[in-house]
Amino acid sequence: MTQQAIFAGGCFWCVEAVFNQIKGVEKATSGYINGTTENPTYKEVCTGETGHAEAVKVEFDATVISYEKLLDIFFSIHNPTQLNHQGEDVGTQYRTGIYYLNDEQEQLANKKIAELQPHFAEKIVTEVLPAQTFYPAEDYHQGYLLQNPQNSYCNLVATPKFLKAKVKFEEIWK
């Protein structure tokens, strides 16, 4: 049975690339969520004025992988204690967030944060909010990391996260 989950963990290139390599994930799509502008562009989102977060919509087979496991992956590929930035990417569009589609996802997200908080010195600032309209990002953003491995940002930031996730989640890597 196909379900959806939406996560924001900084630049969507790495988040999308990791989820697309997980068994049970049918598709991960980079996009924008929970802003005030309809059909925002990347350029508009980068100004920070639209209110959107760079996010990834994950379509997954719940008989193969659970939402809880997706939460584990999400929290392992970004720093949930950084408010409105991930590393050198700064702005509200790079915030950490879980955008739930039903009450169960909200409860599981809040439970996971409560479980993880004792393992962090800083407060987890991941927002847990109802999903508003998800707008897919422009085509050139889809699959960006794997299509542009020589990009300097990818080499310095995204690829190391991707490779770390590949090792950590080897048993469920495609």
UniProtKB/Swiss-Prot annotation:
The active site is at 11. InterPro entries: Met_Sox_Rdtase_MsrA_dom (IPR002569), Met_Sox_Rdtase_MsrA_sf (IPR036509). One of its GO terms (molecular function) is peptide-methionine (S)-S-oxide reductase activity. One of its GO terms (biological process) is protein modification process. Keywords: Oxidoreductase. It comes from the Bacteria. It catalyses: L-methionyl-[protein] + [thioredoxin]-disulfide + H2O = L-methionyl-(S)-S-oxide-[protein] + [thioredoxin]-dithiol; [thioredoxin]-disulfide + L-methionine + H2O = L-methionine (S)-S-oxide + [thioredoxin]-dithiol. It is an enzyme of class 1 (oxidoreductase). Gene3D superfamilies: Peptide methionine sulphoxide reductase MsrA. Its EC number is 1.8.4.11. Has an important function as a repair enzyme for proteins that have been inactivated by oxidation. Catalyzes the reversible oxidation-reduction of methionine sulfoxide in proteins to methionine. Belongs to the MsrA Met sulfoxide reductase family. This is Peptide methionine sulfoxide reductase MsrA. It comes from Pasteurella multocida (strain Pm70). The lineage of its organism: Bacteria, Pseudomonadati, Pseudomonadota, Gammaproteobacteria, Pasteurellales.
